[in-house]
């Protein structure tokens, strides 16, 4: 570890702190239908969209209507993406003449992935997807799935803020305003910033260039005979990368235009582009904590939530940085000390232009949020370094979290935290003037149980059946970690992976696809039910026995609730995976 590395980590957190209030105020004004500086340009576009789609922007919805609208929109969007992949060969902007995405289970997996904001990729983007599919299919879903998440979070906040109301907003209006005001303007500026750093943006066919030094490759055929081939050229992929890269991060989507994701120099060429991408992942989620405080009338509560998130983030990034900077004890003959000429530590799977500090920071950010973008290979981290991204997702990605998803996930933990506080003082728990009753706790626990149930059931099946174990590259505890990470990432709508697992198989494509859909929609519905129930309730003035939700004590209780419910649920599985691998690594055994 180095002072420069810590400075970069603290600089990043300082930037997020600086943007929290202005962005939070802006989003509160947008969703409260207050005037903003963008209204003269965007209001006419918004009204035109409503006229074309026959949406009455003054008509609000009950939580059930809100949920149905969200489910129908997502289902139609997913079907459209599936069809687009299957007829890709006949669509424009396909200079490489890529055929239909095949087999069908891969197209299903990809459609489920981008619809749910997961962006899990069981394919190599530059070898499978045409420019049209990337732009009209995947990038479109990057915008819309992020907008759905923001809409759900805003609906939940309205449920807390409103009194004796049957409605929580209009899904179509919330989603439209999320796209027009929150996502598009910032993505336009961000894409231009990335282009200035060297991220490509074109519709050119792939380039073929001659290698400076020809390479010889020896392969073994099915008959057992080996043959040597001399490679003299290389194909360099092109494409509209910058426009997709920025919404990939700003919308916490994570799916890369290229298979190497944000470690590819065409996606993330410089340290400055790396900072822009990391900042984009956390910005909206941090701002939503201030939006929560502003819309509910308790700004200090918003900061208390921000503080809990920041504390968990700092612990996570510190552990990853320490684990990776410490290096691998099995490589005693390799110089792993930090110096002016090298980053030191475990550099396997990391880009030298970023080093260990920025790779550890990026990995923590992308798994704290439901993003899944990577600038280094998580599978090549040390056991403890790789465990932190895994645990971050297991906590339901509430450490700032995905756009919208992090906020409504955190609100579930808040409901459970104030319920626990109420039990300790022997009175009905209250949250910002609303009594938390049995129905609310049941729905919150339903969310808390669905997540680990999906993960552990699918992981258990994959660990004992040959169609699951046959995809493992590394045996032993690391193989279990690869399986566990796949289903944690899918169910948590993250999308990152331990790349040693071969996932483009019928079992993993279908199982992870189902996990992604369940992790998104089976959790959103109970959340909306809580929002609808809270909106109906009367305001109860705070009394001497009310547990304050604006203090450091509340932040500590919230952190404890997250760790107990989130992390301890998976502790047995972690003990058999990364923890066991760490102990065996220090005993001299590798996998």
From Swiss-Prot:
One annotated GO molecular function: potassium ion binding
Keyword Cell membrane: yes
Residue ranges of the TM segments: 6-26, 63-83, 137-157, 179-199, 272-292, 303-323, 405-425, 444-464, 510-530, 553-573
Gene Ontology, cellular component aspect: plasma membrane
Topology class, membrane: Multi-pass membrane protein
Family, similarity comment: Belongs to the KdpA family.
Subunit structure: The system is composed of three essential subunits: KdpA, KdpB and KdpC.
HAMAP family linked to this entry: KdpA
Protein name: Potassium-transporting ATPase potassium-binding subunit
Species in which this protein is naturally found: Koribacter versatilis (strain Ellin345)
Lineage: Bacteria, Pseudomonadati, Acidobacteriota, Terriglobia, Terriglobales
């Amino acid at each position: 570890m180095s002072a420069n590395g810590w400075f970069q980590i603290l600089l990043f957190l300082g930037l997020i702190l600086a943007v929290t209030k202005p962005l939070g105020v802006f989003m509160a004004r947008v969703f409260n239908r207050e005037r903003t500086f963008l209204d003269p340009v965007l209001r006419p576009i918004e009204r035109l969209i409503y006229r074309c789609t026959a949406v009455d922007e003054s008509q609000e919805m009950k939580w059930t209507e809100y949920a149905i609208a969200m489910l129908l929109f997502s289902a139609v969007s997913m079907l459209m993406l599936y069809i687009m992949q299957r007829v890709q060969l006949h669509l424009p902007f396909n200079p490489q003449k890529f055929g239909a995405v095949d087999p069908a289970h891969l197209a299903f997996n990809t459609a489920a992935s981008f619809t749910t904001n997961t962006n899990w990729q069981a394919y190599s983007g530059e070898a499978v997807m045409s420019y049209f599919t990337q732009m009209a299919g995947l990038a479109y879903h990057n915008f819309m799935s992020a907008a759905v998440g923001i809409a759900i979070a805003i609906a939940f906040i309205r449920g807390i803020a409103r009194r004796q109301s049957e409605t929580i907003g209009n899904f179509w209006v919330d989603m439209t305003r999320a796209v027009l005001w929150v996502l598009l303007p910032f993505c336009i500026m961000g894409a231009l910033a990335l282009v200035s750093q060297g991220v490509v943006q074109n519709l050119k066919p792939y380039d073929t260039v001659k290698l400076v030094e020809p390479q010889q490759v020896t392969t073994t055929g099915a008959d057992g005979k080996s043959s040597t081939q001399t490679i003299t050229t290389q194909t360099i992929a092109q494409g509209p990368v910058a426009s997709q890269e920025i919404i990939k991060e700003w919308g916490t989507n994570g799916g890369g235009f290229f298979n190497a994701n944000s470690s590819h120099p065409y996606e993330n060429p410089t340290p400055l582009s790396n900072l822009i991408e990391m900042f984009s992942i956390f910005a909206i989620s941090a701002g939503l904590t201030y939006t929560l405080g502003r819309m509910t009338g308790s700004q200090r509560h918003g900061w208390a939530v921000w503080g809990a998130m920041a504390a968990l983030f700092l612990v996570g990034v510190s552990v990853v940085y320490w684990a990776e900077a410490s290096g691998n004890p099995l490589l005693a003959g390799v110089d792993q000390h930090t110096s002016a000429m090298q980053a030191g530590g475990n550099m396997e799977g990391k880009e030298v232009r970023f080093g260990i500090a920025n790779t550890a920071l990026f990995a923590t950010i992308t798994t704290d949020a439901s993003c899944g973008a990577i600038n280094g290979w998580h599978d090549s981290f040390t056991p403890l370094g790789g465990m932190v991204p895994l645990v971050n997702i297991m906590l339901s990605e509430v450490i700032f979290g995905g756009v919208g998803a992090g906020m409504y996930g955190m609100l579930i933990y808040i409901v459970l935290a104030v319920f626990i506080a109420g039990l300790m003082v022997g009175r009905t728990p209250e949250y910002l003037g609303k009594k938390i009753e049995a129905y609310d706790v049941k729905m919150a626990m339903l969310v808390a149980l669905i997540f680990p149930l999906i993960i552990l059931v699918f992981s258990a099946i994959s660990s004992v059946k040959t169609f699951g174990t046959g995809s493992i590259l590394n045996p032993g505890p690391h193989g279990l970690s690869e399986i566990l990470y796949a289903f944690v990432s899918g169910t948590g709508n993250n999308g990152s992976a331990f790349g040693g697992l071969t996932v483009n198989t019928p079992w993993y494509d279908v199982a992870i696809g189902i996990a992604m859909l369940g992790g998104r929609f089976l959790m959103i519905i109970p959340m909306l039910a809580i929002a609808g129930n809270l909106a109906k309730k009367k305001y109860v003035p705070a009394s001497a026995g009310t547990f304050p939700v604006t203090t450091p004590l509340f932040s500590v209780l919230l952190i404890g609730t997250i760790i107990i419910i989130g992390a301890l649920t998976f502790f047995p599985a972690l003990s058999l995976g990364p923890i066991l691998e760490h102990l065996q690594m220090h005993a001299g055994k590798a996998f």
